[in-house]
Swiss-Prot record:
<dbReference type="Pfam" id="PF13292">
    <property type="entry name" value="DXP_synthase_N"/>
</dbReference>
<dbReference type="GO" id="GO:0009228">
    <property type="term" value="P:thiamine biosynthetic process"/>
</dbReference>
<dbReference type="GO" id="GO:0008661">
    <property type="term" value="F:1-deoxy-D-xylulose-5-phosphate synthase activity"/>
</dbReference>
<keyword id="KW-0784">Thiamine biosynthesis</keyword>
<keyword id="KW-0414">Isoprene biosynthesis</keyword>
<feature type="binding site">
    <location>
        <position position="177"/>
    </location>
    <ligand>
        <name>Mg(2+)</name>
    </ligand>
</feature>
<feature type="binding site">
    <location>
        <position position="147"/>
    </location>
    <ligand>
        <name>Mg(2+)</name>
    </ligand>
</feature>
<dbReference type="InterPro" id="IPR029061">
    <property type="entry name" value="THDP-binding"/>
</dbReference>
<dbReference type="GO" id="GO:0030976">
    <property type="term" value="F:thiamine pyrophosphate binding"/>
</dbReference>
<protein>
    <recommendedName>
        <fullName>1-deoxy-D-xylulose-5-phosphate synthase</fullName>
        <ecNumber>2.2.1.7</ecNumber>
    </recommendedName>
</protein>
<dbReference type="GO" id="GO:0019288">
    <property type="term" value="P:isopentenyl diphosphate biosynthetic process, methylerythritol 4-phosphate pathway"/>
</dbReference>
<dbReference type="InterPro" id="IPR005477">
    <property type="entry name" value="Dxylulose-5-P_synthase"/>
</dbReference>
<dbReference type="InterPro" id="IPR020826">
    <property type="entry name" value="Transketolase_BS"/>
</dbReference>
<feature type="binding site">
    <location>
        <position position="75"/>
    </location>
    <ligand>
        <name>thiamine diphosphate</name>
    </ligand>
</feature>
<feature type="binding site">
    <location>
        <position position="366"/>
    </location>
    <ligand>
        <name>thiamine diphosphate</name>
    </ligand>
</feature>
<comment type="subunit">
    <text>Homodimer.</text>
</comment>
<keyword id="KW-0460">Magnesium</keyword>
């Protein structure tokens, strides 16, 4: 792969020096480099292949970093990173100590706003535009948002606010690739499809180049766009009603269309909305054919594509959940499955196939997902909301006000609890224990392995109120999984190893590491299973029979399960040394999951080391003293 032009690019200033022919050639080199780079490190691929021309056009036309570009979600920002001096850093993409897979303000002045969760770009860019106006600074503010992210209410809240905000320059670029991760759903998607099928898009695609080679004066261009938008593609009035001047759709892979259009929009004042149509995976046929498979691949050979490896004997927790959901749906016709645009990631593909009338992908709309579930529960349905831990944060008010306050029967299956590895701090599910256990009526369960995940899912499903089961990303330990739908006693843990001196109270999958550490310490290990209701009887029993308590959790220490144990001891007036092990009070960057846990002292060796360091000067480690 030749990179003759790419080798000359060290900043967007270099892009602005290229002629039209060179710019098109650079697009091909940049796309090839993204493909080669991601195939070596893993990462988001399809979305980045689809934004190469758009990224080049934006940096060609706008004076970055003076002008602000905010990338919604941000997983499509690899071309942006490469063009802004981070090409060499792509070798360490999403690795510990390497560059992030998302825009990050601390990483580059070109990253105007940190993103990773969807639908925030318009709000952030609007805030920047108002700040620039107030400071008397003349600059452009661009929010690049995908069609999937546009389905979230926050995007429309921002546009509604922008429509009544005077004297600002704000350009919203809708990157319409008919995909988020899964294909987008809902009325907005149908609306955009009508736009793309309109005569204006057909005309722009067929004769756009000829028109733009003879670009008229700005005012005449604006007048013609207005005629097209209102007379030929009437649905565009939705965006115009918010106060935006709508332009498009145009071909997002045609630099001859993108560059002059952006140049003319830059010359206009006020609120502008550019609708570009791109193809996810563009330029790599395998990704074009299956953009979901190539959304976030691991390492692969681009010459042959992603190969199906030998199936692992260890199921992922996501797979365990998906199978349980189908099994429970067979037994209970009231079960309804809900996901906010994460069908594949949350394991609902088979459920959708088998129970299409009971499957609801509500789009990137976590607030709606939770209250939609509440409404179903009001009428006797049994909703299960399959959602990543980090995304439930977006529906927290609804969880409290609409579900828990009314004590409604909604089960939350929280995937990606704890550290998530390469996606880093933005996607880590570190806070669910703290933010859920304080909510009245809420059950919080944390299984130690795959089989226990199935047991706790059934237990929480049968509980007649709000309940959550948190489980991590990736495969379990290979535990044998019972095929039934058995339950366990609510709020009761179980002793997995009887020792002496020290009792380790483990919450979740770190139970396995705790058991390994306990072998060296001759410690007792309790698999607590529930954070709420917590097993008070077991805590007091272990405190009475041991010299010290150690709590272990893959969650934030502050407000976490260890805090719940201490609250029980304090309430009962029990004085015993307690060591809390968990995630520290800081955001934890991307890296390999196992390596990150080891670095935080949450592998078996680290747990043993922390216990010895805390109690080495006492005689609490009665077993360890003989080792």
């Amino acid at each position: 792969m030749t990179t003759e032009l790419l080798d000359r690019i060290h900043s967007p200033d270099d892009v602005r020096q290229l002629d039209r022919r060179e710019l098109k050639a650079l697009a091909e080199e940049l796309r090839g480099f993204v493909l080669e780079s991601v195939s070596r490190t893993g990462g988001h691929l399809s979305s980045n292949l689809g934004t190469v021309e758009l990224t080049l056009a934006l940096h060609r036309v706008f004076d970055t970093p003076h002008d602000r570009i905010v990338w919604d979600v941000g997983h499509q920002s690899y071309p942006h990173k490469i063009l802004t001096g981070r090409r060499a850093g792509m070798a360490s993409l999403r690795q510990e100590g390497g560059i992030s897979g998302f825009p990050k303000r601390s990483e580059s002045e070109y990253d105007a706003f940190g993103t990773a969760h969807s639908s925030t770009s318009i709000s952030a860019a609007l805030g920047m535009a108002v700040a620039s106006r107030n400071a008397g600074i003349q600059r452009q503010h661009i929010a690049v948002i995908g069609d999937g992210a546009m389905s979230a209410g926050m995007a429309f809240e921002a546009m509604n606010n922008a429509g009544v905000t005077p004297d600002i320059n704000l350009l919203v670029v809708l990157n319409d690739n008919d995909m988020s991760i899964s294909p987008p759903v809902g009325a907005l998607n149908r609306y955009l499809a009508r736009l793309m099928s309109g005569r204006f898009y057909a005309a722009a695609k067929n004769v756009g180049r000829a028109m733009l080679q003879h670009v008229p004066p700005v005012l005449e261009l604006a007048r013609r766009f207005e005629e097209h938008a209102k007379g030929m593609v009437t649905p565009a009035t939705l965006f115009e009603e918010f106060g935006f001047n709508y332009v498009g759709p145009i071909d997002g892979h045609d630099l001859d269309a993108l560059v002059p259009t952006l140049q003319n929009l830059k010359a206009l004042q006020g609120l502008q909305f550019l609708h570009v149509v791109t193809r996810k995976g563009h330029g790599y046929k395998l990704a074009e054919a299956d953009p979901v498979l190539y959304h976030g691949p691991g390492k692969f050979d681009p010459a042959v594509g992603i190969q199906q490896g030998k199936a692992s004997t260890r199921k992922t927790f996501t797979q365990v959940f998906g199978q349980w959901l189908c099994d429970m749906a067979e037994r209970d016709e009231r079960l309804v499955g809900i996901t906010p645009a994460m069908r594949e990631g949350s394991g609902l593909v088979e459920f959708e196939r088998r129970f299409p009338r009971r499957y609801f992908d509500v789009g990137i709309a976590e607030q709606h997902a939770v209250t939609f579930a509440a409404g179903l529960a009001c009428e006797g349905q049994k909703p299960v909301v399959a959602i990543y831990s980090t995304f439930l944060q977006r529906g927290y008010d609804q969880l409290i006000h609409d579900v828990a306050l009314q004590n409604l029967d909604v089960t939350f299956a929280l995937d990606r609890a704890g550290l998530v590895g390469a996606d880093g701090a933005t996607h880590a599910g570190n806070y669910d224990i703290a933010y859920l256990r304080c909510v009245p009526n809420m059950v919080v369960a944390a299984p130690s392995d795959e089989n226990e995940a199935r047991l706790l899912l059934s237990t929480c499903y049968e509980y007649p109120g709000p309940a959550s089961v948190r489980y991590p990303r990736g495969a379990g330990r290979g535990a044998e999984i019972s095929p039934g739908l058995d339950t366990v006693p609510m709020g009761k843990g179980i002793v997995r190893r009887q020792g002496r001196g020290i009792a380790i109270l483990a919450f979740g999958t770190l139970t396995q590491a705790a058991l390994a550490a306990a072998e060296a310490l001759d410690a007792t290990v309790a698999d607590m299973r529930f954070v709420k209701p917590i097993d008070r009887e077991l805590i007091l029993q272990l405190a009475a029979g041991h010299d010290a308590i150690v709590t272990v959790e893959e969650a934030a220490i502050m407000g976490g399960a260890g805090s719940a144990v201490i609250e029980v001891l304090h309430h009962e007036g029990v004085v015993v040394p307690v060591l809390q092990l968990g995630l520290p009070d800081r955001f934890i960057d991307h890296g390999d999951q196992a390596a990150l846990l080891a670095g935080l002292g949450l592998d078996a060796a680290g747990i043993e080391r922390s216990i010895r360091a805390r109690f080495e000067k006492s005689n609490l480690q009665s077993g360890a003293q003989t080792k």
